[in-house]
Every structure is written in structure tokens, then in C-alpha cells.
Amino acid sequence: MIVIGASPSPHADILKVAKKELKKEGYELEIKEYSDYVQPNTALESGDLDANYFQHKPYLDDFNKQKKTHLASAGTIHYEPFGIFPGKTKTLKALKNGATVAVPNDTTNEARALLLLQDQGLIKLKDGAGLTATKKDIVENKKDLAIKE
């Protein structure tokens, strides 16, 4: 029995297809779904899982550094697309001064979100912030957006 932890969608959905194919090859796969990004790594570190499937390499590296864990990547997979959704506002250009913008609360995905906001001209980050950018790296915020993690 191979036990893999995954986020519900798309990862667990993908594993459900793989489970059928693995069964044909004589393998049993158990999929444990997690709705957060911490538990699958702590479960893997403690030996409750054989593998997990939900994160990109920058997140894994940051998790190991922050939590002092020893997880390793088994290989590369697809990279989740990331987008900006205007919510109640019809377009990003229509965002009002002082509007609240939510970003992920983990280091690498927060940085990705901030880089997208910068690409849209909504904020400016200090030079070199890259995939470690946080709210503290915002050097220009003309619309005075409230960035909420």
C-alpha cells in the first residue's frame, strides 16, 4: 500500500486517475486529502505518508528551512497556474484606493502574488525581492492597497 497526501484539487483528482492505472500494475494507492499546506508535509516527515503531492519546489525548500524538516523532492511535476481575480470589482483597473487585496500566507506563494501585482502595475517591489518578496518589500503602492495575508 502506497499512501500519498494531496490537496483535493487538482492533485487528489489526478491521483484518483493514477490509482486506477496503478491497480492494473498490481499496486494499491491510498489517497489522504488535506485542505492546508502544512499537514501533508508534517505527516510525511513523521512517516504517516509515503509521499505527498501538492507543492512546488520553492515551497518545499522554504518549508524545510522554516520547520527544520528533511523532505526531498522526488522530481518535477506540473506548476500550478497563478492568477489575480478582481473579486467584487469588475476589473483590476477599477480597484479603488485603499481596496483590500488578499495574498497567500506562505512565503513563496505570497511572493508570487506580489510579483503578479507588480506586473499589473499595482505595486512596486524593491529590486531583487524575487521569490522571497513579502509585504515589507513593497516600495510603491500608489492605490494604497491593503495587502492581507
Can you annotate each of these PLM segments?
Residues E45-Q55, A99, L122, K143-A146:
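Alpha-to-beta junction loops
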Residues Q39-N41, L49, A113:
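Short, hydrophobic alpha-helical packing/hinge segments within bilobed ligand-binding/sensory domains
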